[in-house]
């Protein structure tokens, strides 16, 4: 299986379709099933990593934790620890790390492919295991984002970047210790510390700074720029439209940085809207606009005539569900 082959392209298309379908479906189902779907994605990814490195891709060899622990020094296999941490509700940094960096790292593997795959068919256990684990390392944070678990704000860009290079630093220190103790051969490498694995950008970095580990710091400004673009894309402003015979405007979507229109309708005097609200870092709700203020929805300037009683996220979810059944709900 080689890069750009028909099999490779078909697998990429099928994987992208599955992940996209999951993003659509997870928005439409109740929260409990969203949680089940995300946990299942994390379990699939972690199970593939465990089966490959903890069991040697065989049910007969038994469990050997040493290779599994060693492979936590590899960027993509670190998802075995990272993604379960991202399931903890108030633990935001692992979610941001998974969304900004791990998802990107896993996607590069699917596009570039490992040189080990060349003599293998697509249905080989080694290929399928690696493909599925990397696919769900992408799907897990994307589905978390679609379900509202992750909001990739720019304030997390520098902390995540620091964690990325903190991870590489820890890997480098451990590798140096193992090399000094004769526990790791010189030709072995984790996370591009010593070897570039033929990847052009790392080859270039190593030519500019031919020193193990330190050449990776040339990637820092590139990562920060990429994270900024990623944040801008997933936090872009949303334009709304009205639908339904009664001209009801009923929207539940993200505007810019976690601002949410919970419920709205139409009156003879103009749009009759509820509170525009957001959650602060402690989870407290804050009303952003008061009656009489003008806001812009699409190309229309709308005056808020009233703010209805504050409603919780669960109540808002039930409202949008009812609107959807009426056919007047606009999914943002």
Predicted regions and their residues:
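Membrane-interface transmembrane-helix boundary segments in multi-pass integral membrane proteins
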Residues: 1-13, 157-162, 166, 182-228
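Aromatic-anchored segments of alpha-helical transmembrane domains
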Residues: 43-53, 102-114, 164-173
